Amino acid sequence: MLPPGLSPQALPSLCFCILVLACVVACQQAVPTESPSPQPELASGFWSLVPDNMKALVTRTRDKWQWFWGPEAVQGFVQTYYDDHLKDLSLRSQAWLKSSKDSLLNRAHNLCPRLLCGDGDQN
């Protein structure tokens, strides 16, 4: 059952929006920050700098790409997708169904013997 005020033509775009929103939420969920304690032989020297450098790199990358995961970017993508692919879907579907029905009726009429179906002009 559709929510009040929602037409059946809006259902595909609503499902797509929910799918995009679910992907965004799944990607933004926090990754556990606890890491296993370093092994004693790797705790000194060059390898001891790796966790700090990786944390800084991940933080910088996350900050630079934060705009991409913001609601404006997703909303813009969804709006563009709707405008390009879904806006006139109802009209295109209706036209396709009508042409398919007409084509099917013409083929069926052509297969029907004249004795049973009569001439097409008598309708």
Curated annotation (Swiss-Prot):
Q: Which Pfam family, an example, fits this chain? A: APOC4
Q: What is its main location?
A: secreted
Gene Ontology CC annotations of this record: high-density lipoprotein particle; very-low-density lipoprotein particle
UniProt key word Transmembrane: no
**What are the protein's UniProt keywords?**
Lipid transport, Secreted, Signal, Transport
Extent of the signal sequence? 1-27
Among InterPro entries, the record links this protein to: APOC4 (IPR028120)
The keyword Ion transport appears for this protein: no
Localization recorded for this chain is: Secreted
One annotated GO biological process: triglyceride homeostasis
Family stated for the protein in its record: Belongs to the apolipoprotein C4 family.
Q: What does this protein do?
A: May participate in lipoprotein metabolism.
- The identity of this protein, by name, is Apolipoprotein C-IV
Source organism per UniProt: Neomonachus schauinslandi (Hawaiian monk seal)
